[in-house]
Amino acid sequence: MDRLPGFRDFYPEPLPHKDVWSADARCYIFDTWKKIAHRYGFREYDGPPLEPLELYTLKSGEEIVGQLYNFTDKGDRNVSMRPEMTPTLARMIAAHERNYRKPIKWFSIPQLFRYERQQKGRLREHFQLNADIFGEASSSADAEIICLLIDILRAFGLTSEDFVIRLSSRRAWSEFFSKRCPDPSKAYEFYQIVDKLEREDPDVSKQKLAALGFSYEEVTAFIASGEPTEELKAILDNLSARGFADFVKVDYGVIRGLAYYTGPVFEAFDRKGHFRAIAGGGRYDNLTNLISGGKFDPASNTVKGGKVDIPSLGFGMGDVVLTELLKERGLLPAFSPSADVCVLIEDLGR
């Protein structure tokens, strides 16, 4: 019997077939993730792989909702396998944030599930490092989370010649949209189009943008301008002071597809352009408010009325693209069976 499409078997080295994945490489990646996260003061958490369907339909966005592994369980509850970890974390924080000193810095390595078209760097399940900070609104937190991302990739042997962090602003895009379109309900659709500009046929993008009242030329001109906002300048100054200026550039071509982002957003790419994004994240300051009962207010483009309102940001780094990148660059160590203890037995009576 064959395994399901888009899922993986992990074998210890040596691998019996090219169509399976290395359990040893997975352990190496997980150990490196944990080591650097602990160095930055992050603590590990976990949550259930099955959640109420509403947790994802609430604010993740239509694209993810269309990729859910969801069903009605024996208790007649609508549930879903988790496609991402951030809503679970926001739910957990909203429930018990008073028990923890701020800022809260947590990480997790969940297995995630999305029913989507298989392609290079994308399967129907993957493991992902999630690192998040709750309770810190200043740009220093944005800089810290990006530094963590950079140092993790450096720990695998990658340098500024191998990858770059493309930094953008969902807030800047929100202002761009609101000045040209009076209907805030179309914002997420617009963000989805921009998110796919680099991967989609230009003629298709032009038609989609025109349907919303935008021209392809004005959108690409905004991307090309590359003028950092004040909040992006503060992040760049912080990263430069830490010696990480060579790893980051402002690029408004990044917008992030998920609906809940509110401020600075970023993605890590290999400079050769051989792979999809290695990692991505940003600010999602409204999510705990929304999950704790808040409602979106189109007039202010914010969420109001929730029981908990905590500034939040973080990123995710999947194991699929990272493993493929490390393989291509020859940065995965050799794995072979080894004994921790060698016992020699000698018969002294002979």
Each PLM stretch: what is its role?
Residues 41-46, 70, 189-192, 217, ...:
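Compositionally biased, intrinsically disordered low-complexity regions enriched in proline and serine
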Residues 23-40, 51-54, 76, 86-100, ...:
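Positively charged, Gly/Ser-enriched RNA/tRNA-binding surfaces
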Residues 16-20, 188, 208:
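Short, low-complexity, intrinsically disordered N-terminal segments
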Residues 3, 18-22, 183, 198, ...:
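Intrinsic-disorder-associated interaction segments
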Residues 167-206:
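Short terminal or interdomain "cap/linker" segment that borders an active site or interface and mediates
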Residues 61-66, 159, 177, 181:
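Short alpha-helix boundary/capping motifs
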Residues 1-87, 95, 143, 164-166:
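TRNA-binding/sensing appendages of the translation machinery
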